[in-house]
């Protein structure tokens, strides 16, 4: 594939330093690296595409929810949309690249070592998320021919540069290079508020996700163990069945994205309306999905977990769990209105646990996988008692619940079941759907004003988001439709 020109670069590159000589000391570089995180969140479109989005049939349709639910390409660049996320990721990448270039010019000194590590891991993360939304999921048999996304490693000094899509394999190779090199350089003592930066644990958590996508299960376990061994991870999980279950709506909302919460390994403050809008989306948690996801009959234990009591709203029109607090930030004190910002969790301890459990299961280490899940359940079953047999997950219960599939697969399904409950509204479910090739069906409800019946199988090209119009206009190859 030949070189192409990617428009839209000016939309993020003009926010970067016009003259890199301004980055003439470690403090300035460190400040720039802090902006190397996408400040747009993906949950609005990821949740809408997933099987977490039922049709309520009553609420107003909004573009960031409706278009992804019916798997139609979006051309707008507004709050919480795929095109906006694309731009935010490349803006973050540009910050990382400018910082890395400045570090090189300063001679790669010890004082810039941690910033270099953070920039490399942040660059890897932004590309990882892009390739999984805008390309096919990693498949060792096809990755060398599947279209990737432009992997940018150099800062742009002009508004428009030349880019190549390359292949998914190319992108994954470069992600792994940046990730492994960057992790070795990180220094947790460098940050005033570590939860907003790639600390070692946050980077290790990212590595568990990366290698889970690659199906390198030994690596998943290796990096998960660096975060916390199974025996030690329980104390770092969200205290749903002891504290959260007693919290009021706004107390829970404040706690969920709090930097002091041990479960929050990496947070980002994103320009987003999702926190104030998701409960009212027409395509979201309706009554049938509430029972499917959180009902007692939804899992091998035949128990409701603590989440169920924290589903607020009273009616499916606004069912929600208060995970996102919106803050309006004004650019000037004279402004009447501010821009909405929400703190989102990019990596949590719970994901590390789930990734390790899934890796154990895929390696045939059934007992260790089930032990991992029981550790999780000790913080999710209300009134948990380790001596109560009803509170203990066993292979027999799993097999009974999934009688038609082998134990390994049934353990994985059990993990995905609890993972779906844990991360509802956060976009994680879509990543599992594309990674594992799960089918998604979206149907209109009787009496609704739309008439949609879509079943999206694992090979349906609409599972891959289309590139922004600006990118296509300047020659990047479109994803098939």
Whereabouts are the PLM-identified features?
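Membrane-proximal, proline-rich intrinsically disordered regions
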Residues: 9-54, 294-298, 384, 437-481
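Aromatic-residue-lined binding/catalytic grooves and analogous aromatic/hydrophobic interfacial grooves
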Residues: 9-10, 200-238
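Hydrophobic-face positions in mid-chain alpha helices that act as interaction patches
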Residues: 221-350, 380-401, 412-414, 422-428, ...
